[in-house]
Each structure stands twice: as C-alpha cells, then as structure tokens.
Regions:
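An N-terminal, well-structured beta->alpha segment
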Residues: 20-61
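Serine-centered coil/turn micro-motif
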Residues: 21, 146, 207-208
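Short, basic/glycine-rich phosphate-binding loops at helix/coil junctions
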Residues: 28-33, 78, 82, 212
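Glycine-rich phosphate-binding loops that contact phosphosugars or nucleotide phosphates
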Residues: 61-190
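Internal, active-site/partner-interface "lid" segment
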Residues: 150, 164, 191-212
Length: 212
C-alpha cells in the first residue's frame, strides 16, 4: 500500500489513497453544493436586482455596507470591489454602529445591509437611524420574510438549498452566493458608469495588473 505523508500528525500517521479519496470527495461535494447555490442565485435575479443597481447608480453620496460576522467580512470585500470600480463605498461594522459609527451615514448615501437570517440584532438596530435620514436600504438576506427584508427599500435573496458544511452550520454556500451577488452589482455598476481601463489604472497606481 502506498502511503502519503499528511504533515505533522499524532503518532506520525499517514494518509492512504483511500483517505485522500475521501478528502477529495468532500472537496468536490463542497464545490458542487456551492455551484448549485450560485445557479439558484442566477435564476432568481429579477427586476429587484435591476432596481438595486439603479438605486446605487443614482446615489449622490457613498454606499455604506453593514454586517456582522461572516456577513460583515463579505460586506468588506464587496465594499472594496465597489470602491475600486467606480462606486465609492465604505464598510460599517454593525456592532460598532450604535456606539457612534452611525455618524458615517449621511442623507446622500445608500445603505446595503447583510444578514443571512435577516434577524441580526446589531443590523436591525440600524434601521431607525437609516429611516430617520430617509436613506434607501438594500437588504441582502436568505429570508424574504425577515424583519430586515421587510424594512428594506429593495430585498435581494441569497437563499441556498443547503450549506456545504456537513454540519449545516458554517456559512459556506450562502456566503459564496452573497459574495457573487456583490460582484454582480459591482460589475453592472461598472458597465453602467462606463468605467474604463484607464479609470481602473488611476485607482490602482500601486498595483500590477494586466489590461491586455
């Protein structure tokens, strides 16, 4: 039997081809589940997505993206993508928002809130302030019946049939779908703004990129 080293393990254990096959099976199943989630998302896109793009395009200020936990991390990446492709955006940590950081939102801005359950307390606590400013809010959740979805100007669903996590607990397929939806918003805005390669270069003076 051929043995493959697995790294530093107790009692110098080794991985057999059978064990490696199990690992590959899990990896492929993970990707299959996440691909299925993306396909669901693609087929679900409708006029609400177009409404969200137009809302962000018409924004006279900046786009504020807010979330907690894994949703917050995804929101940070989407904020960076928007900013680098012609749509000024900032991430607002929902947990810090009620301790003074709500001041970053102005009446000229638009807000995108992220919560897969749509019931994250720290995110829901922001709604009163957002409404008081009359700021439009796009909610990205996995539950159209959630409090966050119902309070939004536009709701975009990232619901998935199941997570890739075998425990059904860790955000995997849902976080991938959320990230992809953010990319879709950013690329539609890029195209709508006629954002060019020269514009991209202007925003990336310290980077190495290939425009060929």
């Amino acid at each position: 039997m051929i043995l493959l080293p697995c790294g530093i393990l107790k009692n110098r254990e080794f991985c057999t081809f059978e064990k490696m096959s199990t690992l590959l099976k899990r990896a492929r199943e993970t990707l299959t589940i996440e691909i299925a989630g993306l396909e669901e998302l693609r087929e679900r896109l409708d006029h609400e997505f177009e409404q969200a793009v137009n809302l962000l395009y018409d924004c006279q200020g900046k786009v504020i993206l807010a979330g907690m936990g894994k949703s917050g991390l995804i929101a940070q990446k989407i904020a960076a993508t928007l900013t680098s492709t012609g749509t000024p955006a900032l991430f607002l940590h929902a947990g810090e928002s009620s301790h003074g950081d709500l001041g970053i939102i102005t009446s000229q801005d638009a807000v995108i809130t992220f919560s897969y359950s749509g019931e994250t307390d720290e995110v829901l606590q922001m709604i009163g302030h957002i409404n008081a400013l009359g700021v439009p809010m796009i909610a990205i959740t996995g539950n159209p019946d959630s409090a966050l979805a119902k309070a939004s100007t536009v709701h975009l669903s990232v619901a998935v049939d199941k997570e890739a996590c075998p425990l059904g607990l860790a955000p995997t397929a849902s976080s991938t779908a959320t990230l992809a939806l953010g990319d879709a918003l950013a690329m539609c805005l890029l195209e709508k703004r006629q954002f060019s390669e020269d514009d991209f270069a202007l925003f990336h003076p310290g980077g190495i990129w290939d425009a060929s």
